[in-house]
């Protein structure tokens, strides 16, 4: 029976082929599949770590953005406060300057009033002398009556 010998030969060839595949082909295939599996697992783990890092970086960026916004608001508030203080200082300086100018003007006016009174006293004295001269139709001696005129001037 050739069938048995053929079957037996096929079984021997099968086992030899199986042994060759198990010995030489199967380990590199398993190794390649294991390496591929580990690379995929590492890639998935790296992707997960990347997602976590992205979420962390996103949170940090949001915190930094909020911090920058708060600092901006604070700086604007400080600038407004400084501007308000500067405006108040300018207003106070202007009021002080206005008070000084008003005081100076009042002093000048008082001095002008005093000068005008002195001028008027002198003119009144001269007019009084001329009036007396005309009334008496004679010349009044200015030296003789100088003290009298100065006293009159002081009274006016």
UniProtKB/Swiss-Prot annotation:
SUPFAM superfamilies: F1F0 ATP synthase subunit B, membrane domain. Gene3D superfamilies: 6.10.250.1580. Its main location: membrane. GO terms for molecular function: proton-transporting ATP synthase activity, rotational mechanism; proton-transporting ATPase activity, rotational mechanism. InterPro entries: ATP_synth_B-like_membr_sf (IPR028987), ATP_synth_b/b'su_bac/chlpt (IPR002146), ATP_synth_F0_bsu_bac (IPR005864), ATP_synthase_B_chain (IPR050059). Coiled coil: none annotated. It is found in: Cell inner membrane. The chain crosses the membrane at residues 7-27. Keywords: ATP synthesis, Cell inner membrane, Cell membrane, CF(0), Hydrogen ion transport, Ion transport, Membrane, Transmembrane, Transmembrane helix, Transport. GO terms for cellular component: plasma membrane; proton-transporting ATP synthase complex. It holds the Pfam family ATP-synt_B. It comes from the Bacteria. It is a single-pass membrane protein. F-type ATPases have 2 components, F(1) - the catalytic core - and F(0) - the membrane proton channel. F(1) has five subunits: alpha(3), beta(3), gamma(1), delta(1), epsilon(1). F(0) has three main subunits: a(1), b(2) and c(10-14). The alpha and beta chains form an alternating ring which encloses part of the gamma chain. F(1) is attached to F(0) by a central stalk formed by the gamma and epsilon chains, while a peripheral stalk is formed by the delta and b chains. F(1)F(0) ATP synthase produces ATP from ADP in the presence of a proton or sodium gradient. F-type ATPases consist of two structural domains, F(1) containing the extramembraneous catalytic core and F(0) containing the membrane proton channel, linked together by a central stalk and a peripheral stalk. During catalysis, ATP synthesis in the catalytic domain of F(1) is coupled via a rotary mechanism of the central stalk subunits to proton translocation. Belongs to the ATPase B chain family. NCBIfam families: ATP_synt_b, PRK05759.1-2. This is ATP synthase subunit b. It comes from Polynucleobacter necessarius subsp. necessarius (strain STIR1).
């Amino acid at each position: 029976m050739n069938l048995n010998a053929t079957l037996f030969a096929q079984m021997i060839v099968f086992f030899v082929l199986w042994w060759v595949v198990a010995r030489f082909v199967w380990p590199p295939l398993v190794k390649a599949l294991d390496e591929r599996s580990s690379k995929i697992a590492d890639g998935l783990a790296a992707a997960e770590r990347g997602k976590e890092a992205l979420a962390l970086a996103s949170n940090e960026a949001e915190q930094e953005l909020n911090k920058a916004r708060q600092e901006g608001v604070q700086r604007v508030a400080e600038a407004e406060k400084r501007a308000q203080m500067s405006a108040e200082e300018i207003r106070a300086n202007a009021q002080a300057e206005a008070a000084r100018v008003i005081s100076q003007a009042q002093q000048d006016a008082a001095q002008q009033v005093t000068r005008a009174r002195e001028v008027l006293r002198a003119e009144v004295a001269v007019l009084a002398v001329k009036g007396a001269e005309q009334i008496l139709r004679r010349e009044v001696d200015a030296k003789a009556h100088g003290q009298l005129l100065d006293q009159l001037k002081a009274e006016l």
